[in-house]
Amino acid sequence: MKLPVTYKVEDKDGKARAGVITTLHGEIETPVFMPVGTQATVKTMSKEELLDIGSEIILGNTYHLYLRPNDELIARLGGLHKFMNWDRPILTDSGGFQVFSLGSLRKIKEEGVYFSSHIDGSKHFISPEKSIQIQNNLGSDIVMLFDECPPGLSTREYIIPSIERTTRWAKRCVEAHQKKDIQGLFAIVQGGIYEDLRQKSLDELSEMDENFSGYAIGGLAVGEPREDMYRILDYIVEKCPEEKPRYLMGVGEPVDMLNAVESGIDMMDCVQPTRLARHGTVFTKDGRLVIKSERYKEDTKPLDEECDCYVCKNYSRAYIRHLIKVQEVLGLRLTSYHNLYFLIKLMKDAREAIKEKRFKEFKEKFIQRYEGK
């Protein structure tokens, strides 16, 4: 079976890879950071701005779009690309992470997850089949398995049956997938911070490999120590199929991103850059900058003196601080624009470094300055 999403490695430097993912809506150069458009919009950003900052792919959220405005409505309106006027690739998550984050509002059963809406308390049920059906309706280029997401520091006793359920659910997702010719399905490797359990999860999913266009690493950056995340990435990523893209879910901190790339990760996403931006925190080459701070009240410098984004070319720290302090929408837009640009550019620079066989030096130099060491 020819898969609708393919990957080609162009260059390697150690384990780090520069490549190209091909989808029906275009190509994606990797490594890549993917802005998150939870409710069919990347918060505060227009399509034109997303293209301007170099976005090649964005995320949509299955859980949120199922609740509002509803996946069937989006399908009737021509699918998610048409609905949000975005003609480049889209990845949809399965809704699993959001449903499992509901805590007491959800009940896990073998058939799926029963939950109450965080909006109005209405009762809902998402199964592996339902998750795939929603994603088929949305019409994204990359769809994700519906997996069980164990909490950050879960015990082995909790994780073993959880992995086995994820494998059973994976089989059901594969069978339910109605658009295998146009939507690439990604597997999700779980296993917490235990190397042997990560291996178990990957081994079980690999038995269905011909159905998967890529492999995601789930269940990291959920509260475990950083060292554990790096150790697991270092162990499991290179064991994923070489000829398919590898996606680290939910990571958007610059240092973590570069360490992930070093382990062989190709794709990452996170709400962090826009969430931090809305609270007045921005990324710079010298680390995070809290723009609300009094010290920037009369600062005429740009957010990052070495950044060539539209915001840094046109606005001062003092002005952006003022906007954030008085809660003007433009402030949120400018900080969001800059943060997303920063992470997308970081991955483009990492790609160049890999192609020029200087990634390790690039990474160490960036981290040393970013962490002020």
Swiss-Prot record:
Catalytic residues, chain numbering: D93, D269
InterPro entries recorded: ArchSynthase1/Queuine_TRR, TGT, TGT-like_sf, tRNA_ribo_trans-like
Highest taxon, organism lineage: Bacteria
GO MF annotation, one: metal ion binding
Pathway(s) annotated for this protein in UniProt: tRNA modification; tRNA-queuosine biosynthesis
Residues annotated as binding Zn(2+): C307, C309, C312, H338
GO biological process: queuosine biosynthetic process; tRNA wobble guanine modification; tRNA-guanine transglycosylation
Names of required cofactors: Zn(2+)
Keywords: Glycosyltransferase, Metal-binding, Queuosine biosynthesis, Transferase, tRNA processing, Zinc
Keyword Heme: no
Keyword Protein transport among UniProt keywords: no
EC number: 2.4.2.29
Summary of subunit composition and partner proteins: Homodimer. Within each dimer, one monomer is responsible for RNA recognition and catalysis, while the other monomer binds to the replacement base PreQ1.
Protein name: Queuine tRNA-ribosyltransferase
